[in-house]
Amino acid sequence: MATMISNLPRDLIEEIFSRVPLTSMKAVRLTCKSWNNLSKSESFTKVHIGRAATREEKTMIVDVMPHKLNLMSIVIDDVTPSAEFKGQFSLLHKNYRINQVLHYEGLLLCIMKDPTRIVVWNPYLGQTRWIQLRYFHRPHGIDHFRYALGYADKESCSSLKFLRFLDYFYKAPEEEFFWYEIYDFDSGLWTTLNVTPHWGIYSTCPCVSLKGNTYWPAKERSTQGFQDYIIRFDFTRERFGPLLALPTDRESSFVSLSCVKEEKLAALFKHRLHHDSYEYEFEIWITTKIEVEMVSWSKFLRMDMRPKMELPLTFYIDEEKKVFMGFDHGEYPKLLFLNVVGETGFLRKFENIQYRSPCSYVPSLVQVKKLARDRLRKQRSLENRRFAQNILRLARNGKS
């Protein structure tokens, strides 16, 4: 007697359906109510999204809402780009509220509404690691710390590390204050970094992590100029590198960075077309080579955006298809639009996207390990003194 597929065990049905292409899932959902419910379950989503991301040509976009992760795929074809909501992952409990999220190789660094701790989350594996912060600084409810996630290369493995810093470089010299510290996932210890910054990184500039290191748009600390450089933090050496020049020789009122397949950096520039106008054009450049002390660039795309698109909050590119994807609010601050632009101009505008802070996403098998009890260590007395000195300096400068 033949067995009907609906009578098979749930885990076997999930395994079968996980091999169905994303573009064919609509037919599966319409077959019956139970299959529709199964296709939206968290256990099925983990398996299906993981396989689909490597099987199909698409860009996966995620957005962390207060306590959950939404997933959307964008497919760029030769006819019409398409977007589809793919599912959700939940972060433990609804009481955990997320303010900000940074993405790195399938891991999410979540800055919580609770100012005393953060969480590193692999939604694909369902693993989390909570980190207790030594101090928080949120005057008027605004978090002035900046954050980055990366890893240090060791002989046999890679070790996750977490950087955060506070830097009031735009103050008068006598009022300047900076504090850079790093957290080691293996030891569970904080270390105050001995740095004298020659750079300035604005708090509104998001970072990009690539091959274990993190990059920011930056400026020379001693000047009032634009962000004409990028700067890298090396998690293995635990130090910043030199300022590396950006490729444009035009004054840019805005610079943003993105990753290209976890292999290259992309830089987006916003240029004013005329000194007396508010019309702009965008340029995108991609790195052809990037090392500790040098970087080379190649122009990818130029876009005259008047009047179709505002300043992109986040952007991604498909290098092979010569396509740009950027999110902006347009004239409606409560709505979000996704603009898809190619060499020939606008391809499509997706309206009313229900995303707050979207970023690209590829499911990852990177382990977020818990700190073993037998490896618990106490902070050294020297580090405790450095921490106390920074707290005192911060209070004296009137910024606590």
Swiss-Prot record:
Residues 2-47 form the F-box domain. InterPro entries: F-box-assoc_dom_typ1 (IPR006527), F-box-assoc_interact_dom (IPR017451), F-box-like_dom_sf (IPR036047), F-box_dom (IPR001810), SCF_F-box_component (IPR050796). PROSITE patterns: FBOX. Pfam families: F-box (PF00646), FBA_1 (PF07734). Transmembrane segments: none annotated. SUPFAM superfamilies: F-box domain. This is Putative F-box protein At5g41510. It comes from Arabidopsis thaliana.
